[in-house]
Each structure stands twice: as C-alpha cells, then as structure tokens.
C-alpha cells in the first residue's frame, strides 16, 4: 500500500511538469478568433483562390468584324474551319487560369449551343452540318484539363422577338439558362452583362434568375454589376481601386446602374460579401479582329498587379479567331505572361526568414497562430495576435541582405477582411524607412516599388476592423516591369498611386516584447 501511495504522489507532483513540457494533451487549445462578418461562401472562396479566369468572346461577331453584332447576321456566317475547344482549355490551364468563361449568347442573340428555344443558334449554321455544340465541346475540354466552366448569357437579346415583353422574355431567358445549367455538368460561374444599347425597354426578373441559377448549380457564383456573388469592378481596364473591400452593400447599386467609385473600392461597412472581378481584353476589342494586335506580356503583368494584387479576380479575354483557334500571337503572349509570373514568384526571399511578432494569440509559445505561419502560402494558416491591442507589428529577418522590389501580403479571408491601414519598413543604416503604405489587403495584395536592399523588414498594422490576421508575407524581385525593374533603380518621375515610397524615417525598432517562432 505504501508503494502505491508513493507512486500516486509522484504522478501528482510530476503532472504539472509533464503538462508544461507538452507531454499530456489535457491543456485546452486556443480556438480561432471569431470571424468578422461578412465572410465568403464556399463557392466565393474557391472562386477567389483561382485568381484568374480566361474569357472567350466568340460568335458571329468573330466573322463579321463587329462587337455588338447585328440581328440580321445570317447564321451561315458562323463557320469556323478548325475550332478546337481543347486548345482554349489547354491555354487556360497552362496559364494558371482557374476556369474558362464562354459567351454562350452575346447581345446578338446567337446561341453557341443548340437551344430548343430559338432558331438562331449553331444548329442553323453550316458548322458541323448544324450538329455542333461549342458549349458542349468546351465543357468536355475544361473537364479534361481540370479547370472550371463559366457561361455568359447576355440579358440583352437583340434577336429574340419577345424581348420587351416582361413575362414572355423572362420565361424565355430562364428556359435558356435551364438548358445551359442542366446539360453540361458543373458550372462555376454565370456571367450577367449589364450592357444594353438601343431597343425596347425590358424589366429583368433578376431575383428569379438568381434563385434558379443557385438552385441548378449549388457551387456557382453569379457575376453582375451588383452581385449577388461577385461584382463588376466598374471599368474594362482590369484595374481595381487602390483600396478594395470585398464587403459591399448589394442594395446600393443595380445591374446597369453602378456607382463607379463604390464598385471599385467596396465598403468596409458593407453587409454582403461581394468581391470584385476585373475584366479586360488582351486585344483592343472583345471579339477577334484581324486588324488588331494583342497587348504584350508586361502590360498583362501590370494588370495582374492591379487586379489580383488588389484583392480581385482577373478575367482576361482572349478571343478565338475566325478559324476557331486562339491566334498564335495571343498564345505567345499568354506563355510569356505565365513565364514572367513564375520567374518573379518562384523565389521568395522571406521563405526562410525568422519572424517575430508583438503578440501571439494564446501566448508566445502557441504554434497554432505563430508568426512563422505567414511564411506558408496558404490562407488556412495564419498569425493571430492577442486580443485587446490597438496596433500590431511583425519583424522579419531574411537571414541575409537581399535586393527586391515586390512585397506580397495576404489575409485569411474566410475569417473576414480586416486590415484598414498598414505599412512595411526596411532597416537601412539603423533607420526604419517606409517602402510601402497601404489600406486594404484582402485575399492578396501586391506592391511594387523601386529596388531596395536590406535584411530586416517590419510590418506595422495601424488600423483594422478587428484583430488583424496575416496568412502570408512574401518578398520578391521583378526584373520585367518597366517602371520597377532592376535596370531602373531610380525613383520614377510619376509614381503609381498604389505605391508610397520612403515616407517615414525613425529610430524605433518596434515593441521589444516579441515572440519568435
């Protein structure tokens, strides 16, 4: 009996030590902080993670050298000689685009699938003897390449005779939408264009459309000027606002009637999660024209910085030509654009950095929310501070001096968008010098600036809707961009408004009560 009592006493005395060293699992883990509403749905989150989509404007306009087309265009003009939807899908997959979005019906009303509700479709064309189905071929090609399918169905239909009759046309439109969403498998995005020119007045029953789309495709996102799932950024240049919130009030705008600055910037007080989508064409027009040439790869890179790099999704239009292929010169630009991005973002100078932070949620030793989590490029692990702070700091020791001109920041947006104001500084000659100041971060924020060199960086967050959460911090070199390349070290005469260079100099090294992970 005495031996048993001694053993029990030893266990009781040793238990605190075992707990202190993590031998037992009895200590309760620290839960994640509460999300800050609104937050994305599953479909919205997957949409944002894909970063880019490839837009495909194709139809009779391709053959008639027009943009909005004509209701009088003979279906016989649609006669691609070498249409290869597989080429379109392969180009998208190779370029890092998460989905393809096809103009299944543009404003001219011509349908790229054999719709039973109109005689103005591929079924009336000579292509494949009237037995062709562009939507079907692209759906199969997208599945084969492991990318998603999106469909554009223009609300404005210049051909349909019942357009202008509220009940009849809404029934017609819902019928065509049902065909598209029940014949071709999963559809990840439905694109509703707000454009409308001349013609009859028409009241669209958008709520009924949205309900049907979500009913037929549970993981779809719907794009329009006003959502409900993703919004137009307000321009066709592919450029988002310097400040860009995903929170938004859908009731503030209507389809076809936007407030440009509100759409560009979003709303920190918005009640709805409606992230912005930036649309732009690789060519001057949306449809292919033999007389037009594509943008170059560095122009696309600049657009990438100002769209994906400002918390948006980039949808880049690359229109197939009249043969039914993406032109060789466009393919070359896409390849160069991809190679440039891979070169820039394949070497992160902060990948092996030592990271410290002013506080850590759950205590300095809590690995779950450790500062080092920001070195993993994933929104599902992140640094979180203790509650009750009003400003926050993270310090980065790169291990050795590096020259760089791009910084990437990310928030775990599944927890809501939080950061309102931040800055990044570099230690130069024992002085902290500000290299960038920013407002929002969101899913991804990319900053360009003239080349700097140093080993120690500091991220200071000066304002947030709630305790800030950071999921990634990266440091890169871009030697391709004309403005901020290694060959152009001098500060440009005109600095883009999204970059504020060397604003502040002081001797403060931040809070010394830091955690190192």
Curated annotation (Swiss-Prot):
UniProt keyword annotations, A-Z: Apoplast, Glycoprotein, Glycosidase, Hydrolase, Secreted, Signal
EC number(s) on file: 3.2.1.51
Signal peptide start-end: 1-20
Positions in coiled-coil regions: none
Biological process terms in GO annotation: fucose metabolic process; glycoside catabolic process
Role description: Alpha-L-fucosidase is responsible for hydrolyzing the alpha-1,6-linked fucose joined to the reducing-end N-acetylglucosamine of the carbohydrate moieties of glycoproteins. Active only against 2'-fucosyl-lactitol when heterologously expressed.
The protein's name: Putative alpha-L-fucosidase 1
């Amino acid at each position: 009996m005495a031996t048993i009592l001694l053993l029990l006493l030893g266990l009781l005395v040793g238990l605190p030590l075992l707990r202190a060293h993590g031998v037992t699992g009895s200590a309760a883990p620290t839960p994640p902080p509460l999300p800050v509403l609104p937050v994305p749905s599953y479909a919205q989150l997957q949409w944002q993670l894909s970063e880019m989509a490839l837009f495909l404007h194709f139809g009779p306009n391709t053959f008639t050298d027009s943009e909005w087309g004509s209701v009088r265009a003979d279906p016989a003009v649609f006669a691609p000689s070498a249409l290869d939807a597989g080429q379109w899908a392969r180009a998208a997959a190779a370029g890092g685009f998460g989905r393809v979005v096809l103009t299944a019906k543009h404003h001219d009303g011509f349908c790229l699938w054999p719709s039973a509700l109109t005689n103005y479709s591929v079924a009336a064309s000579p292509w494949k003897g009237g037995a062709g189905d562009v939507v079907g071929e692209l759906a199969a090609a997208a599945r084969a390449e492991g990318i998603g399918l999106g469909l554009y169905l223009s609300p404005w239909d210049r051909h349909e005779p019942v357009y202008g009759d509220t009940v009849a046309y809404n029934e017609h439109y819902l019928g065509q939408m049902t065909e598209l969403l029940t014949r071709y498998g999963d559809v990840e995005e439905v694109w509703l264009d707000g454009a409308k020119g001349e013609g009859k007045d028409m009241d669209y029953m958008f709520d009924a459309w949205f309900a049907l789309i979500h009913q037929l495709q549970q993981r779809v996102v719907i794009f329009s000027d006003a959502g409900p799932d993703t919004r137009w950024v307000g321009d066709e240049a592919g450029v988002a606002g310097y400040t860009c919130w995903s929170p938004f009030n859908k009731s503030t705008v209507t389809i076809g009637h936007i407030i440009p600055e509100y759409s560009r910037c979003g709303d920190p007080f918005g009640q709805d999660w409606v992230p912005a989508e930036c649309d732009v064409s690789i060519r001057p027009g949306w449809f292919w024209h033999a007389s037009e040439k594509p943008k170059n790869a560095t122009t696309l890179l600049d657009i990438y910085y100002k769209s994906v790099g400002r918390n948006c999704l980039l949808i880049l239009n690359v229109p197939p030509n009249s043969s039914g292929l993406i032109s060789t010169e466009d393919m070359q630009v896409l390849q160069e654009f991809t190679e440039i991005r891979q070169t820039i973002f394949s070497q992160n100078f902060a990948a092996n950095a030592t990271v410290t932070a002013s506080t850590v949620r759950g205590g300095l030793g809590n690995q779950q929310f450790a500062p080092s989590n920001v070195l993993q490029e994933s929104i599902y692990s992140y640094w979180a501070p203790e509650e009750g702070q009003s400003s926050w700091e993270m310090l980065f020791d790169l291990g050795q001096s590096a020259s760089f001109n791009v910084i990437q920041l990310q928030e775990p947006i599944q927890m809501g968008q939080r950061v309102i104001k931040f800055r990044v500084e570099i230690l130069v000659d024992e002085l902290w010098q500000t290299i960038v100041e920013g407002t929002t971060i969101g899913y991804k924020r990319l900053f360009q600036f003239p080349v700097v060199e140093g080993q120690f960086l500091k991220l200071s967050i000066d304002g947030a809707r709630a305790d800030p959460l950071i999921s990634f911090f990266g440091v890169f070199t871009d030697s391709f961009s004309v403005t901020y390349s290694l060959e152009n070290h001098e500060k440009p005469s005109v600095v883009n408004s999204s970059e504020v260079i060397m604003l502040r100099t002081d001797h403060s090294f931040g809070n010394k009560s830091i955690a190192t992970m």
